Regions:
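Dynamic helix-loop-helix/coil hinge segments at AAA+ ATPase domain boundaries and subdomain interfaces
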Residues: 11, 17-19, 63-85
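Conserved P-loop
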Residues: 84-162, 212
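Interdomain "pre-motor" coupling segment immediately N-terminal to P-loop NTPase/helicase cores
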Residues: 17-69
Length: 257
């Protein structure tokens, strides 16, 4: 490698162009071998740098997302989940609802794929360089309560609640909220109203949600009013995936009497 090569790579590093620094000579040789133009060479190295930056951005977004694992729409079995509205679900994956700050609510019994679809939407958003946050309702309440007790609620709200363009809250209704927790959750929905998209999953119909919000019917109604104003409600029916797997290996669920 000659001194000119060294100078080019040093300049690339100073300009924060690491991908070009490592690959420019390869693209130069490739362009020469294909009788390409200077413009072809410039386009090739800029395309390479852009792709590398996109990949680094996606890796950071994935690390910060809270997604426990990668799920995709392609992994979702519509042949088994016959109660899932396929056309409605597929349309959500164009992610236009995020650009419009609209919400999505997945309703259905345990095991029908609500969390799978919400995680898949989150992953698709990350692949489009959209900042997301996935969290269970229980963990969200724990973090909100801790921030409130420490006098850091405003900071937490700004960073964790308003920061993500898409906030995914899983398992609403599995554990009931106390009065203070219900108020904190209402503030989450109220602050994100028409500012960012929120995805909720719940095993409870809307008519029973107040049971999870300290039986506060008024607060629940106000929360739903904001949540559902610009919202795609996806009702999924069917048998639990997990129950299906147990049956396949010969484990029968116990029936309470």
């Amino acid at each position: 490698m000659n001194l000119q090569y060294d100078r080019i790579e040093q300049l690339c590093q100073k300009l924060n162009l690491p991908a070009i620094a490592s690959q420019w000579s390869h693209h130069a040789q490739q362009t020469l071998g294909q009788d390409g133009s200077y413009a072809d060479f410039v386009e090739a190295i800029l395309t390479h740098e852009y792709a590398a930056r996109q990949q680094r951005s996606q890796q950071v977004l994935m690390k910060l997302s809270g997604l426990p694992q990668v799920k995709t729409l392609e992994d979702y079995d519509f042949n088994y989940a016959l109660g899932a509205p396929k056309s409605q679900v597929i349309e959500l994956f164009n992610l236009s609802f995020i650009a419009r700050a609209e919400n999505v609510v997945f309703l259905g019994a345990s095991g029908v794929g609500k969390t799978h679809l919400s995680m898949a939407l989150g992953y698709k958003a990350i692949m489009n360089n959209i900042k997301i946050k996935f969290i269970t309702a229980a963990d969200l309440m724990l973090q909100l309560s801790t921030a409130y007790q420490q006098g850091k609620l405003k900071t937490y709200m700004q960073r964790a609640v308003l920061g993500p363009k898409l906030l995914i809250i899983d398992e609403i209704g599995y554990l009931p909220f106390g009065r203070e927790e219900a108020n904190l959750f209402f503030n989450v929905i109220a602050k994100r109203y028409e500012k960012g998209s929120t995805i909720l999953t719940s095993n409870l119909p809307f008519s029973q949600l107040s049971k999870s919000f300290a039986d506060n019917v008024t607060l629940t109604a106000a929360m739903l009013d904001r949540l559902l104003h610009h919202c795609h409600v996806v009702q999924i029916s069917g048998e639990s995936y997990r129950l299906k797997d147990k049956k396949r290996i010969g484990i029968q669920p116990q029936v309470e009497t």
